[in-house]
């Protein structure tokens, strides 16, 4: 993960006795000079802060009143929740409870919490109490430092997945949780330290300055410092879940053609997208266009002729958008140059902005077989998901950068041995070869070497997909398969016609004699061709339900099923 945002608490974290530590202020300015965004996130009111912050502005945004008020440079304050309920304020006054009010927050001594709870219950108000050391704050439900920070970053066009938060007290829990790394200071709340990703050592705000400068020296947060966010790979034979920490690592997914490797990679993408990571997916064959069914995903066709690369670069820089770059319509000979251009662009953007968070390269052996141009693959930044069926054709530098290896079925001995050579822990080559060849279509194995696998292989059943998946859907709709894999329509053993694409089959069905259609259906020929040549098990199952039915109904059902799946007219 490339740091892009620094979210800092005020009292007890960067400030003591109402004043920001001078060394922390210098470190914050140094971070801004490098392009890091800095956000102050505090329970204090803006008027209170204005009396204590002096000199040039240190922050790109201030989230005040524990997430309820936002200030951006050159703009008036923005309230992110409604103001205090007048009935609530009246009851506080009637009971003589000392308090201070901001634009949205009501602040009081923590000792009066029981009385305030009784007032909230009696008035049936949707209010929450947050404690901060010896004080408490009352705000509407759902308002906290995390919600305020997320609003600030949305307006700054930045992501919590590039953010590091530092805090010291009870009201910092949500902020540390929502950021990619949450750091608690060693001199603060014990409960916060227990839940934090890491601890800032030291005994006062000056230590935060050292922590900031250490971050500035890093192009990427090391994977071992990141482990909270995970994706589900699947389940073991005993039903135990197997998870993989995201950690910004480069992950290699290898396996034979039609073995389920794109399905596996797609499952990882779905989970990352739903955790609001921004992905850039280089999709040579249209395998991942189905991800557009998920929120925040856009499929962008790249054919090299009508592609606006300037507009595409703007899309890539959006922190809340995942892109599937569909190259299936590009001429095969043009794809290496197109992918190289795209990789150079996306790698530069990741260095500059921290997004996209992850880059998937399918059929990676075609595009990363040599690293003559270091801009094609950022070895230092990492964060790639590489999918390949020819591990032997990948650059050795790319292979060495892989930090977790997932394998679907492999029958090719040479490819299997190359995969096994990447990791320790396989007792004998014969044992590893047997394992990889024995995997079912819905199984995979996490090879030894990663933190999660330890020193042994972890075999698992792949987690279900959320979006429908069709292997090479766009390619096989229009691009002819080899002659030896075409569908031959026959009657009494004599050929009547041929189909080399899905659209050929769809166009031929209305013209075929009923007995030819019924014969192929009864023998399961259509289903086997769809499953074995195209690897489309879902459509194959739909066709199975038509086998043995009335010819006219079956023909119409077959045409509808294909048209719904691949596009085109069913009638």
Give residue ranges: language-model regions.
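Mg2+-dependent phosphoryl-transfer enzymes with acidic/Ser/Thr/Gly-rich catalytic loops
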Residues: 1-3, 21, 139, 146-227
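Alpha-helical substrate-recognition element adjacent to the catalytic core
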Residues: 1-82, 105-106
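Walker B catalytic acidic pair
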Residues: 10, 284, 362-364
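Short, well-ordered beta-strand core segments
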Residues: 31, 62, 182-184, 199, ...
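P-loop NTPase catalytic phosphate-binding loop
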Residues: 227-358, 367-385, 389-393, 398-401, ...
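Terminal, compositionally biased segments used for targeting/anchoring and flexible tails
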Residues: 431-571
């Amino acid at each position: 993960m490339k740091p892009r945002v620094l979210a800092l608490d005020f009292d007890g974290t960067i400030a003591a006795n109402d004043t920001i530590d001078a060394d922390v202020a210098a470190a914050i300015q140094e971070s801004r000079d490098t392009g890091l965004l800095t956000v102050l996130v505090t329970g204090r009111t803006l008027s209170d802060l204005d009396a204590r912050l002096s000199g040039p502005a240190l922050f790109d945004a201030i989230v005040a009143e524990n997430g309820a008020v936002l200030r951006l440079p050159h703009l008036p304050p923005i309230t992110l929740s409604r103001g205090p309920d007048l009935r609530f304020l009246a009851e506080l006054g009637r009971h003589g409870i000392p308090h201070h009010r901001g634009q949205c927050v009501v602040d009081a001594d923590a000792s009066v919490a029981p009385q305030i709870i009784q007032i909230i219950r009696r008035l049936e108000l949707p209010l929450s109490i947050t404690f901060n050391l010896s004080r408490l704050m009352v705000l509407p439900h759902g308002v906290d430092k995390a919600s305020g920070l997320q609003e600030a970053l949305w307006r700054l066009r930045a992501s919590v997945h590039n953010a590091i938060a530092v805090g010291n007290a009870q009201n910092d829990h949500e902020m540390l949780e929502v950021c990619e790394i949450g750091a608690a200071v060693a001199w603060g709340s014990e409960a916060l330290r227990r839940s934090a990703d890491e601890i800032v050592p030291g005994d006062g705000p000056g230590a935060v300055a050292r922590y900031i400068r250490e971050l500035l020296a890093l192009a990427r947060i090391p994977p071992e410092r990141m482990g909270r966010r995970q994706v589900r790979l699947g389940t073991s034979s005993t039903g135990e879940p197997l998870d993989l920490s995201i950690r910004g690592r480069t992950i290699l997914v290898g396996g034979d053609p039609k073995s389920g490797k794109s399905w596996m990679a797609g499952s990882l993408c779905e989970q990352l997208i739903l955790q609001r990571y921004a992905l850039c997916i280089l999709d040579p064959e249209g395998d991942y266009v189905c991800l557009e069914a998920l929120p925040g995903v856009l499929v962008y066709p790249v054919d090299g002729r009508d592609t606006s690369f300037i507009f595409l670069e703007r899309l890539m820089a959006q922190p809340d958008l995942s892109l599937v770059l569909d190259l299936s319509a590009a001429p095969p000979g043009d794809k290496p140059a197109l992918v190289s251009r795209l990789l150079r662009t996306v790698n530069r953007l990741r260095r500059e902005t921290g997004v996209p968070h992850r880059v998937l390269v399918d059929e990676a052996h075609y595009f990363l077989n040599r690293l003559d141009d270091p801009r094609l693959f950022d070895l230092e930044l990492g964060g790639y998901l590489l999918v390949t069926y020819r591990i032997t054709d990948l650059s050795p530098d790319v292979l060495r950068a892989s930090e977790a290896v997932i394998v679907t079925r492999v029958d090719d001995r040479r490819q299997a041995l190359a995969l096994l050579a990447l990791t320790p822990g396989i007792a004998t080559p014969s044992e590893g070869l047997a394992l990889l060849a024995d995997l079912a279509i819905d199984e995979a194995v996490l090879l030894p070497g990663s933190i999660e696998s330890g020193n042994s292989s972890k075999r698992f059943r792949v987690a279900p997909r959320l979006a429908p998946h069709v292997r090479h859907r766009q390619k096989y709709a229009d691009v002819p398969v080899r002659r030896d894999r075409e569908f031959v329509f026959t009657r009494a053993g004599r050929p009547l016609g041929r189909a080399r694409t899905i659209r050929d089959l769809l166009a031929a069905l209305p013209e075929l004699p009923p007995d030819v259609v019924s014969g192929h259906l009864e023998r399961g020929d259509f289903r086997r061709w769809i499953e074995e040549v195209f690897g489309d098990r879902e459509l194959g199952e739909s066709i199975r339900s038509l086998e043995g039915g009335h010819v006219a109904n079956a023909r119409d059902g077959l045409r509808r099923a294909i048209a719904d799946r691949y596009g085109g007219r069913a009638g």
